Amino acid sequence: MDEENMTKSEEQQPLSLQKALQQCELVQNMIDLSISNLEGLRTKCATSNDLTQKEIRTLESKLVKYFSRQLSCKKKVALQERNAELDGFPQLRHWFRIVDVRKEVLEEISPGQLSLEDLLEMTDEQVCETVEKYGANREECARLNASLSCLRNVHMSGGNLSKQDWTIQWPTTETGKENNPVCPPEPTPWIRTHLSQSPRVPSKCVQHYCHTSPTPGAPVYTHVDRLTVDAYPGLCPPPPLESGHRSLPPSPRQRHAVRTPPRTPNIVTTVTPPGTPPMRKKNKLKPPGTPPPSSRKLIHLIPGFTALHRSKSHEFQLGHRVDEAHTPKAKKKSKPLNLKIHSSVGSCENIPSQQRSPLLSERSLRSFFVGHAPFLPSTPPVHTEANFSANTLSVPRWSPQIPRRDLGNSIKHRFSTKYWMSQTCTVCGKGMLFGLKCKNCKLKCHNKCTKEAPPCHLLIIHRGDPARLVRTESVPCDINNPLRKPPRYSDLHISQTLPKTNKINKDHIPVPYQPDSSSNPSSTTSSTPSSPAPPLPPSATPPSPLHPSPQCTRQQKNFNLPASHYYKYKQQFIFPDVVPVPETPTRAPQVILHPVTSNPILEGNPLLQIEVEPTSENEEVHDEAEESEDDFEEMNLSLLSARSFPRKASQTSIFLQEWDIPFEQLEIGELIGKGRFGQVYHGRWHGEVAIRLIDIERDNEDQLKAFKREVMAYRQTRHENVVLFMGACMSPPHLAIITSLCKGRTLYSVVRDAKIVLDVNKTRQIAQEIVKGMGYLHAKGILHKDLKSKNVFYDNGKVVITDFGLFSISGVLQAGRREDKLRIQNGWLCHLAPEIIRQLSPDTEEDKLPFSKHSDVFALGTIWYELHAREWPFKTQPAEAIIWQMGTGMKPNLSQIGMGKEISDILLFCWAFEQEERPTFTKLMDMLEKLPKRNRRLSHPGHFWKSAEL
């Protein structure tokens, strides 16, 4: 029942008591279900995720509609006809659950003492006074007033508002973040201390440090007006604000200007008159007399700026303004300009330490631009050149022993999703389990704190050539590739030239002594189509077509060929409809059938044979260890070609240690499943779990590396339709993956149970749950690669997906197989996309197949077919026929199943021959929602039960 479909005439006509009660109870059931889902999203899901936030907003809007619907139904009944049961709607305790009011407050309110209608008739002040009597705090009062205001507007408008007006506008805190039940207010806001222009400019550099600090503990919002440089060539922080003047909080535009520095500003020194001090009027501050510059005026040390010359004015009583000259956009091949670095007696290094401000010291100045607390050299500045130039700006030399982060490029953060056992957000200072981490500057913060994060900067380190600075990307550390000989830090020299901004050298080297290493997703596998087959030789005998089908719109395909012909073309399977192209140096296309020495025919040449593995009932694995993510990177060996640096323990190894479970702590029970990835046992580890044992050779480094790589991919998945990963045993020879124990039966057995009725509504609900889980995995950059009904568990309407990503280690686990055999499990071929079928070969490992997001969509189409046909496609045909038909894009006869047009359209979309034509899981969800619903008839027993309750 959707209130949007209700006409105005229905809204205005009165209702009888019985009908109003029936509608209120029906809406109440929907409220109970929505509140349960809402609380699950708030407590069990990562609320910093954008998708979770969107789902929460949608549920809140629906609940507002439902409560408005109950109020409308109650309003249509005359006062004299109402009874106590109708007066109980809408229920105040359910509204308090939406607002996330504490249970202690609800317990203080006696039944019938306060109603939601009473609160709607009160003002905001009266609401606060009323609920504060029962123990509510100010935050709860603010949220309650915001929710009541939304409900009041919706109810008064009669439901004619736009969708945006249905959303509860939660109040904001002082830090500008929403005070909603998902994002609670922060007790201590992130204090951003920026540099501000002083109303008066002192005449000496020393006076730049003589000021009073602001009140301790108070947030300091000081806008960056300009950076002043004294007549001495040393870089000095700007002077402070005089006592009696308070700094202005930055406007949203100014905050954006601070966080988004220019790409290639030029720095020139010009004379600037003293700024005008701010004026006070009625306890409010006016903007300074001198308007603040735009974001392009901010100073940032990035490539492309001109040489710094001393101002022609020698009046030391005037400050020198660092401004930007108007220059066109930097081109890719623009020649880098030189920055000569000297030491000078006028530099800030020579200022006595007791005269330096703790707020505007050189450390805070640099940390403001870079976003990190840099290391300061403990040695005095060293002159890098004997000859001094009067027109160059002198700055202290860097310490050669410590890599610096002082110079960096203002670029966008490269965030990746992370999971920590215990971590603190750099921005807001609060603890977090889920969050984001920048791969460049290692910033760690909540998803909601990214807008407040400081700008990102790449580390610039020195190569052996003293004339260049080399910008390097963040280089990951492979968990199994040891680093080689460390360099001597004495080889690092001061640079006099900045590199080109848009050109990265091939000989980049890793960053020394980074706090940790980050990674790129390695869960996804590139989907590269195989090279087409060469043409048939003229001497080859044209074979007869295999399984001709009237459904195939393509020409008839030739199938049986002599094995010698395959060997001649490097064991390649021939699809005659493919246009031949010359062979390339890349890996040659592979054959999918295997030569054997028995049954010789065709002039003694052996036929090619496929080995089909029998189906095992224990093949259904009771659940799978997975928790995956987007953040494991392979080592870029080209970056290690020149030299390697010693590093601290990598973040990857730290994560593996956190998820490592000692094998001795596991209690292994009975065997519950056996598949291609190992045996699965029922066990106990702080409760019931599923334990999958992985059998690999003790000295096989490839197998161990593949296993650890998959564990790194599993550790960050958190979704109700994805099995929960709990840990892994990573000490050979005991390798195991531990997950939660899935309840219910596999979808494979449910579909084939004749006692279970699968109507359109149930099949759509199952498919929607699978699409939700797969869409989540794809959003995290994870491919399933083995999606089938045996890897999906179904229990009372809940669907859980298992075994995702484990296909990557299946190839190395079958190292002992015969080289001329292609092992195919029963029912596996019908889940493979045509582009994968064409790549099958006995000499191609299964983890090297071109799996992609499109191939997962194809596998979902097979499950969709199985839900309606209750069997696999091409069930009665041999493996050779299935390979041929699916490799050429042929499909089974759908008319024999009796599918509707809408159902078959979804299937044909998923089974599209061209992978680009297959829909995404997001689009599939929309298609499933548009399927016609089968409503119950009025004679359905459920309606009689409802009337009996009334």
Swiss-Prot record:
Entry keyword Zinc-finger: yes
Enzyme Commission numbers on file: 2.7.11.1
CDD domains reported in the protein's UniProt record: PK_KSR2 (cd14153)
Residues that coordinate or bind ATP: I672, G673, K674, G675, R676, F677, G678, Q679, V680, K788, D803
Catalytic activity reported: L-seryl-[protein] + ATP = O-phospho-L-seryl-[protein] + ADP + H(+); L-threonyl-[protein] + ATP = O-phospho-L-threonyl-[protein] + ADP + H(+)
Annotated ranges, domain Protein kinase: 666-931
Phenotypic consequence of R676S: In a lung adenocarcinoma sample; somatic mutation
GO cellular component, one term: cytosol
Pro residues bias spans: 531-548
Phosphoserine PTM positions: S474
Residues the record lists as binding Zn(2+) 1: H413, C438, C441, C456
Low complexity composition-biased segments: 259-273, 517-530
Cystine crosslinks: none
UniProt xrefs under InterPro entries: C1-like_sf, Kinase-like_dom_sf, KSR_SAM-like_dom, PE/DAG-bd, Prot_kinase_dom, SAM/pointed_sf, SAM_KSR1_N, SAM_KSR1_N_sf
Zinc finger (Phorbol-ester/DAG-type): 412-456
Pfam families membership: PK_Tyr_Ser-Thr, SAM_KSR1, SAM_KSR1_N
Entry-linked SUPFAM superfamilies: Cysteine-rich domain, Protein kinase-like (PK-like)
Membrane-topology descriptor: Peripheral membrane protein
Swiss-Prot/TrEMBL GO biological process terms: calcium-mediated signaling; positive regulation of cold-induced thermogenesis; positive regulation of MAPK cascade; Ras protein signal transduction
Binding-site list for Zn(2+) 2: C425, C428, H446, C449
Tissue specificity: Mainly expressed in brain and kidney.
Membership in a protein family: Belongs to the protein kinase superfamily. TKL Ser/Thr protein kinase family.
PANTHER family: KINASE SUPPRESSOR OF RAS 2, SERINE-THREONINE PROTEIN KINASE
Name of the protein in its database record: Kinase suppressor of Ras 2
Organism: Homo sapiens
Gene: KSR2
